Amino acid sequence: MFILTRFSDKHSRPITQCSYMAAIELEQDYYLHNFKALLKTVEQYHASLLTTDEKHWLQSFQQLSADAQMLLIRLLSRKGILFRFNKLNYEEITNINLAKDALIHAQFISQEITALHQQQVISISDIFSLYTKPELQRLFPTLIDKTDKKAEILLKLESYDDSEYLLSVISEPLVMIQQQTLLAKFLLLFFGNSHQDLSQFVLSDLGLNKFENYQIDTSTQLFHTTEQVNQWLALTQLSDLYWRAHETKDYDTISSVVPLLPKAASWLPLENKRQKLINHIARDLERNYQYDIALALFRQTERTPSRERQARILMAQQQYQAAYDVVKNIQYDPKNEDEYGVSLRLEKKLAKSVNQIFTAPKTFAPKAIQLQLANPERQRVERCAARYFESQGWTVFYLENQFLNSLFGLAMWDIIFAPIKGSFINPYQLAPLDMFSSDFYLKRKDLINERLQAIEQGHFDGWQTHFETKQGISNYWVHWENFSQQALTLALSHIPPTQLAMMFRRLLKDLRHHRSGMPDLIMFNDTGYQWVEVKGPGDKLQDHQLRWLAFFDQHGIPAQVAYITFSTPSED
């Protein structure tokens, strides 16, 4: 039997949207309840990180009517800070005009657009970008040519010397949110990161995301000072600016971010975030042949692949000895297996240029078979291979990394979500905060070792229970939509317990990097099981795949590579 499952990204987090769950109808004011829950947590646990003005904002919000609160939340949730009021239409708000007036009176929003422009809070472009090109042509028929693009129109209006006239043409109310950045701060304090937002509440309300009922550690906070919060938010703004430029390959804007980067931070979470951004910027500038700037940036970071990129830039600049020195530094103290593997390839390329002899390490050659298969439907090579093995009597699962990762998540479920200090700071986490650091193992060493010993002895207590009772609950490791009861049953009945424990031990050595590179197929028959990595024409084994295959070979775990070629119709 061939069980085919496929997902979009082999390195992605588990899919938690459950298609089998019935649709849930939300109350019209669902977002008001969610926002109040957000504010309650911020006030209760993070008050020391709020300024006097921010505390006043919270108090003023509580005094608003429900309509005014909902309108403010709607505006905060929209893109931008300026809005055409007449375009706003929310059925759940009984009287939107009264709500607007209340927000103006409490200084949450302003409609004094002329004054705001004179104070240089907003520009002419900010204001008129709210309008479509046809609307602008109707407003300013003598200033705009029909052939002008909208960007050209905005430039013309921005450079027009009578802004008072331009603003006088507007006959409808415009509103601007005051202190719009507050929402970003509240979300950051609540989630402890910059990528989750109010939509997370909605996904949970709809039942599309379910989370484990773990114990939240209210005594632990990611941020300890207001300065840390402000620095994080500022760095997030820079990061957002970079990613927008990256998407359009706007290298001028990317370069403009460089002088805005903050100095190295003593607070480790912020410094990690800073170095991650620097690596991205440096890599883009390297692609744009701005080698000197890219090299200077990479030298500011310790995160991989900084040293690899330094060596490659130096090679491109024909500074071979300097590149060789970087490579040797990597080999002396590699960050991980990937970095070490890359250093060997770079050393081989550099050896002749620096008058060194390169001694190639012994390479591992995995067991392999050659298959010529028909593919009239032009399917993925993994599907063709899976169907071939199915015809040979195997039950085949095309799961790649998801098979072993899901087993690991089920086996360690209670340990992953154990109440360890500092692990959980909000109700919407897929894993503890230290999941991919060395602290994960160190803080749970006794629990993990005890579990591994139990597995080696053939005790799989809790795996089936976790599969049944935790179904659909978000866990970074368990891929519910693809990992089936049959896959679990066959794994526990066919894989020797000692081999399962060995594979978990390798995962635990480096959870971030070892969670990928596993073979495409896992197969079972009456006599045993087999891993199979499938390679089509011209496809080569990657380093992390070779390392898993070498590990399997070392420990007697059955695995092979299937090299596939496709027969032509005349050969069938």
What role is predicted for each listed range?
Residues 536-558, 563:
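Mg2+/Mn2+-dependent nuclease catalytic core
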Residues 483, 487, 491-503, 520-538, ...:
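Conserved catalytic cores of phosphodiester-cleaving nucleases, focusing on short active-site segments
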Residues 19-57, 63-69, 74-281, 352-495:
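N-terminal alpha-helical interaction modules that lie
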